[in-house]
């Protein structure tokens, strides 16, 4: 996937949010995707931070603005502003801690309570490099994703497994929604956003599911 300088022209700006319990690896997934870095000593995020990455998606230059927030309960008052304008989300759990997977349903309810119903959501089972400690079976996560019409992948921010694939898939699905609206509207629709505006995914139909997991 080709990279682009932050100051280059882009066709779309998509806001993505990372959600899930504290310690599941949200910040390291973000730094792995945007900077190809991993910090073994990363501390829990305090408040909100975001990073951007500009990349090519189906021939268009897309700038992803990716927001990361603390998973701790005491920081959840920020949710309304955090979710506002988001068109994609990565719902992340730790494959070695079943409780983080159990809490995914609550995070999903919160997300859907603050965003458009057709937001593109990818369920992420992170830390799949720790195969000997796995507490959440892939089949269990797939079943949840199917019930909730989510995409699904297992990732490792540590060794970069599926990190690029996961973010790119979410951006690709958002772009497909925007492209479909443009075609259905007879070309350049007046309600399609310009540079720097938020993409609204309101008019999309059912979300298809794509499964992915760590290779053995």
Swiss-Prot record:
InterPro entries: P-loop_NTPase, Rab_GTPases_membrane_traffic, Small_GTP-bd, Small_GTPase. Disruption phenotype: Slight increase of primary root elongation and lateral root branching and hypersensitivity of root growth in response to exogenous auxin. It comes from the Eukaryota. Signal peptide: none annotated. One of its GO terms (molecular function) is GTP binding. A lipid is attached at residues 213-214 (S-geranylgeranyl cysteine). Changing residue 126 to I: Decreases GTP-binding. CDD domains: Rab11_like. GTP binds at residues 20-27, 68-72, 126-129, 156-157. Keywords: Cell membrane, GTP-binding, Lipoprotein, Membrane, Nucleotide-binding, Prenylation, Protein transport, Transport. GO terms for biological process: cell wall biogenesis; protein transport; response to auxin. Belongs to the small GTPase superfamily. Rab family. Involved in auxin-mediated response. May be involved in vesicle trafficking of components involved in polar auxin transport. Binds GTP and GDP and possesses intrinsic GTPase activity. Plants overexpressing RABA1A show reduced growth of roots and shoots and smaller leaf sizes. NCBIfam families: small_GTP (TIGR00231). This is Ras-related protein RABA1a. It comes from Arabidopsis thaliana (Mouse-ear cress). The gene is RABA1A.
């Amino acid at each position: 996937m080709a990279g682009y300088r932050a100051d280059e022209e882009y066709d779309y700006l998509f806001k993505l949010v990372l959600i899930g319990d504290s310690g599941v690896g949200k910040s390291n997934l973000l730094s792995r995707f945007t900077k190809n870095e991993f910090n073994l000593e990363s501390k829990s995020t305090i408040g909100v931070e975001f990073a951007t990455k500009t990349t090519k998606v189906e021939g268009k230059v897309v700038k992803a603005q990716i927001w990361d927030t603390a998973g701790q309960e005491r920081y959840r008052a920020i949710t309304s502003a955090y979710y506002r304008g988001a068109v994609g989300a990565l719902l992340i759990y730790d494959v070695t801690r079943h409780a983080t997977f159990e809490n995914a349903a609550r995070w999903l309810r919160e997300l859907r309570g603050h965003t458009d119903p057709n937001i593109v959501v990818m369920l992420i089972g992170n830390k799949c490099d720790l195969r000997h400690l796995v507490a959440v079976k892939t089949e269990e996560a797939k079943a949840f994703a199917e019930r909730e019409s989510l995409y699904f992948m297992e990732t490792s921010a540590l060794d970069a497994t599926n990190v690029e694939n996961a973010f790119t898939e979410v951006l690709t699905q958002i772009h497909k929604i925007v492209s479909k609206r443009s075609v259905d509207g007879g070309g350049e629709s007046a309600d399609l956003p310009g540079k720097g505006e938020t993409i609204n995914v309101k008019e999309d139909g059912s979300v298809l599911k794509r499964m992915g997991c760590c290779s053995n």
